[in-house]
């Protein structure tokens, strides 16, 4: 009734917008009728739902004049000719897009978004037959959401004319309620069935639909109430006395279930019932109220959380599992899957509960089927489905067809194909009656083993560059079946020969597995032969294989066999020991070379450090000489042209020019003339320092401040450049760029906002390109108080919906790569990896909407050539970052306990190298980490009891003059 009210309320609004009719109104209406095609169908569907089959004869229906008025109002702003031209252009554009989508689906039928876009465009163009076919194809591959089903049902209801059409709509409703638990679809189903109450068996049909709806979603605490009320209203409308008991029954059933607004339902029952409410009903009602209080925390948690609310649903499921009510457990699983239909673990848990507890064939198989339609890339769901079908006696042909679908599902790992083949082969093996020498089932099993090996070699190995079965598990199982169940050791030996030729001959466990099979089902001769081959080929544990051979000969062999075994084992072990010694010598030589290189680097650093110290010692004398010769500085420069003095802070201020003239010197070199003396240069540098404002950081404003780094050093006026960027996030109070003492921009700054939410929004601008470099935006955190604080905005774990692409050409742009990736699904995000200078590294991360699209993109794009570069595409799974171990004390051999070296925040600087031998080092206090730059090196105690007095610069100058 709400829909009818909304429809009738919109009519006067449309009339008021239409206004008086003009002379050219008929042309305008004709031009606008196509524009309102979709809207009129939607209104018709909603009106049909509310009014029943005879809606077009009622006064409240949407008449053609109403539609004309709406069309006139819609087209009042433009002339007929202009609108017709715009519409033709839009229609042509839509047709091209429809053709593109159809072609894309012919290539990849599992592209979910292409299906949705095609249905939307076909519906917009009014292609009713085509849109019905498109929906049918999509529903065969994917489960449809509640919105897609309701849209489809409304369109079909609007076109239904007779009883046959009504049966077709009933069939659609039956399919719709099987995909997900949808209270709204059940409500629509019940209301639509009421419209057919006049047909034969109509009343029973309505009651059947409502009863099934209550069984499915009647326990839904927040949405089940609407179904109960709709059912009661229907029964109340039937005024026969015999029907009153049915209404009583509905009230009593509803009041015994914990639902929201139970008090209002109880009050309504008291008002409706002429007789006093029975005591048993009141007791059930009070019990339901108590249960409601237990469920409320979980329901409120769902209301407060945002979709998909997986954690809240998991907690709710755990609670229901403890109570153990199968109906409520099934309901909460179904509710969780509506929002988390792409979570394989949730489907596995649900199907596992049904397999072990309920064991109802139709229910179990239905859930398994829905699971593989939602998550076709998860091999565990397929293997569980095969087991469930076998458990419930499904026909062999159906199971085989399901297995073929699994092979085309697009698994993301080679091992997944091995697992699904294993599940299918196990099923085929259980069908065989091995008491018979030959049977159809046995031949089918052998053919399946042969096909599995060919499939893994041709299909899987070409796609993933690996078979997924390095240990040849499938061939081992086949060999066991032939040996133990078929008594065919000849075939088993052939299989094991093939296993060994695939790189497994060097492993002792493989030979021992073969030996045990021969021991159980073969003969001594073949056992001895297998062990002799194992002794010659095994490289990982040859001693163990030799021991097994000697043990067998000790119990079963002759003297000659014993002598041969001893000779072979001794020869083999001697060769193995020789190889190990050579490998150890080679390893030792490499270690020695590394130590020599390290020693050379250490000496070079020591020499460099000593030279640096000498220069520091000569510093005071040089400065003194410079001060004494300031007046004759120009003459000294001419007399000693080989000496070059460092001019500090010689960068001129803005608007000034440097007063330096350059003249050609001897041998083509340039000699500077008319250069200011150092005293004037120092004065200029001091003035520059005074001009640079000191930046004082207020730590109390860290929550509204962000730290911006990796900016170009050449950026002029950072405040003016950055302010427009960050004002998009909110009001900027201040931008504090950091300059060096010479006035150079240091590439980072602080941006202070007025509100905290603006600062949080600014963090999303991290890695935004500014003058060709990625700008880093991070929270403002005092690292002296939080030394371990790090911000990495990207996940470092397995993300099945995200791809990692390597080998890209450096010239490939984001737009070009996005255009390539769009062909395989909806791209939510694409990130080209760059260095700090903004140069591409040939790597990229592409995030798709779901795991299915990502797996399809891997299969299609891996090995693709882009601008003569062959790219590699894989599911994003970054390696674990190395976490520095906690420092531990270590003890030198024969010496004192040594504390671990402590370095600053920037690692190990060259000036921290200690030239004191480790044996003489004493443990000292660990130096604190510095905020910027390395921490001070730990002090080393001198051998003397008292510390020597510090020497001044003059003392060092005297020592230097004594030389």
Curated annotation (Swiss-Prot):
GO BP annotations, alphabetical order: mRNA splicing, via spliceosome; nucleosome assembly; spliceosomal snRNP assembly; spliceosomal tri-snRNP complex assembly; transcription elongation-coupled chromatin remodeling
Residue numbers bearing the Omega-N-methylarginine modification: 906
Tagged with keyword Phosphoprotein: yes
UniProtKB keywords: Acetylation, Coiled coil, Cytoplasm, Methylation, mRNA processing, mRNA splicing, Nucleus, Phosphoprotein, Repeat, RNA-binding
Coiled coil regions in record: 21-46, 82-110, 559-619
HAT repeat copies, ranges: 126-158, 164-195, 201-237, 242-275, 324-356, 359-391, 394-430, 487-520
Domain of life according to the entry: Eukaryota
Region entry Required for nuclear localization, spans: 600-670
Skewed-composition ranges (Low complexity): 1-11
Record Pfam families: LSM_int_assoc (PF16605), Lsm_interact (PF05391), RRM_1 (PF00076), Suf (PF05843)
Modification sites for Phosphothreonine: 657
Protein name (Swiss-Prot/TrEMBL): Spliceosome associated factor 3, U4/U6 recycling protein
């Amino acid at each position: 009734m709400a829909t009818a009210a909304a429809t009738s309320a919109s009519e006067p609004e449309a009339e008021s917008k239409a206004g008086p009719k003009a002379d050219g109104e008929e042309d305008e209406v004709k031009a606008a009728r196509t524009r309102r095609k979709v809207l009129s169908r939607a209104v018709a569907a909603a009106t049909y739902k509310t009014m029943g089959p005879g809606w077009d004869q009622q006064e409240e229906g949407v008449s053609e004049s109403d539609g004309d008025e709406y069309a006139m109002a819609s087209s009042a702003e433009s002339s007929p000719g202009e609108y017709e031209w715009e519409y033709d252009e839009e229609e042509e554009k839509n047709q091209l897009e429809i053709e593109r989508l159809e072609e894309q689906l012919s290539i990849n039928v599992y592209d979910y978004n292409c299906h949705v876009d095609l249905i939307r465009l076909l519906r917009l163009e009014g292609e009713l037959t085509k849109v019905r076919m498109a929906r049918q194809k999509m529903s065969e591959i994917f489960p449809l959401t509640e919105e897609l089903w309701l849209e489809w049902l409304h369109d079909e209801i609007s076109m239904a004319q007779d009883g046959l059409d009504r049966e077709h709509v009933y069939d659609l409703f039956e399919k719709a309620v099987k995909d997900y638990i949808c209270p709204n679809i059940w409500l629509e189903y019940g209301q639509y069935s009421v419209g057919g109450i006049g047909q034969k068996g109509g009343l029973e049909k309505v009651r059947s639909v409502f009863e099934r709806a209550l069984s499915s979603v009647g326990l839904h605490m927040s949405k089940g109430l609407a179904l109960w009320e709709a059912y009661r209203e229907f029964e109340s409308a039937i005024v026969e006395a015999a029907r009153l008991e049915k209404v009583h029954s509905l009230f009593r059933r509803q009041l015994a279930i914990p639902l929201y607004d139970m008090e209002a339902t109880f009050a309504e029952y008291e008002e409706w019932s002429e007789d006093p409410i029975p005591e048993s009903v009141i007791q059930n009602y009070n019990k339901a109220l108590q249960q409601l209080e237990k469920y409320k925390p979980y329901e409120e948690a769902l209301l407060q959380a945002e979709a998909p609310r997986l954690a809240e649903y998991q907690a709710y499921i755990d609670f229901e599992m403890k109570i153990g009510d199968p109906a409520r457990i099934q309901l909460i699983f179904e509710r969780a899957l509506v929002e988390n239909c792409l979570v394989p673990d949730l489907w596995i848990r649900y199907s596992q509960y049904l397999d072990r507890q309920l064991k109802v064939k139709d229910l179990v198989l239905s859930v398994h089927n829905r699971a593989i339609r939602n998550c076709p890339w998860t091999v565990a769901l397929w293997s569980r489905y095969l087991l469930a079908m076998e458990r419930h006696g499904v026909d062999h042909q159906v199971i085989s067809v399901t297995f073929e679908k699994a092979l085309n599902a697009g698994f993301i790992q080679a091992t997944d194909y091995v697992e699904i083949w294993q599940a299918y082969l196990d099923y085929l093996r259980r069908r065989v009656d091995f008491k018979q020498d030959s049977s159809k089932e046995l031949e089918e099993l052998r053919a399946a083993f042969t096909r599995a090996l060919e499939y893994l070699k041709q299909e899987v190995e070409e796609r993933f560059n690996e078979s997924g079965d390095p240990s040849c598990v499938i061939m081992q199982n086949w060999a066991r079946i032939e040996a133990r169940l078929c008594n065919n050791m000849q075939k088993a030996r052939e299989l094991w020969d093939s296993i060994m030729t695939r790189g497994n001959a060097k492993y002792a466990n493989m030979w021992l597995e073969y030996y045990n099979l021969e021991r159980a089902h073969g003969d001594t001769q073949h056992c001895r032969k297998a062990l002799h081959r194992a002794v010659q080929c095994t490289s990982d544990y040859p001693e163990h294989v030799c021991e097994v051979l000697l043990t067998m000969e000790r119990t079963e062999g002759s003297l000659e066999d014993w002598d041969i075994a001893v000779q072979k084992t001794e020869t083999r072990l001697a060769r193995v020991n020789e190889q190990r010694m050579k490998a150890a010598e080679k390893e030792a030589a490499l270690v020695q070379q590394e130590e020599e290189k390290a020693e050379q680097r250490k000496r070079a650093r020591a020499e460099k450090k000593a030279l640096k110290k000498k220069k520091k010692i000569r510093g005071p004398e040089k400065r003194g000489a410079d001060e004494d010769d300031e007046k004759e500085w120009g003459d000294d420069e001419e007399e000693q042209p080989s000496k070059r003095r460092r001019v500090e802070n010689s960068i001129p201020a803005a608007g000034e020019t440097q007063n330096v003239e350059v003249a050609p010197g001897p041998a083509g070199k340039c000699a500077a003339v008319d250069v200011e003396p150092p005293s004037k240069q120092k004065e200029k540098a001091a003035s520059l320092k005074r001009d640079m404002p000191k930046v004082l950081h207020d730590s109390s404003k860290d929550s509204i401040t962000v730290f911006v780094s990796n900016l170009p050093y050449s950026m002029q006026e950072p405040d003016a450049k950055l302010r427009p960027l960050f004002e998009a996030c909110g009001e900027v109070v201040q931008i504090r760029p950091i300059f060096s003492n010479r006035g150079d921009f240091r590439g980072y700054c602080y941006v202070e906002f007025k509100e905290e939410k603006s600062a949080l929004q600014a963090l999303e601008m991290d890695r935004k390109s500014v003058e060709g470099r990625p700008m880093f935006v991070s929270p403002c955190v005092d690292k002296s108080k939080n030394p371990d604080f790090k911000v990495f905005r990207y996940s470092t774990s397995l993300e099945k919906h995200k791809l990692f692409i390597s080998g890209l050409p450096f010239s490939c742009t984001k737009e070009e790569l996005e255009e390539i990736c769009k062909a395989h699904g909806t791209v939510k995000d694409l990130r080209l990896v760059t260095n700090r200078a903004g140069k591409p590294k040939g790597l990229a991360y592409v995030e798709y909407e779901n795991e299915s699209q990502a797996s399809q993109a891997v299969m299609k794009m891996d090995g693709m050539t882009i601008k003569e570069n062959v790219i590699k595409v894989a599911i994003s799974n970054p390696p674990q970052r190395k976490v520095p171990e906690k420092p531990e004390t270590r003890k030198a051999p024969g010496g004192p306990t040594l504390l671990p070296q402590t370095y600053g925040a920037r690692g190990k600087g060259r000036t921290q190298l200690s030239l004191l031998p480790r044996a003489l080092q004493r443990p000292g206090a660990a130096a604190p980490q510095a905020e910027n730059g390395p921490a001070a090196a730990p002090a080393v105690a001198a051998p003397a009891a008292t510390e020597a007095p510090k020497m001044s610069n003059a003392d060092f100058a005297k020592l230097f003059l004594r030389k």
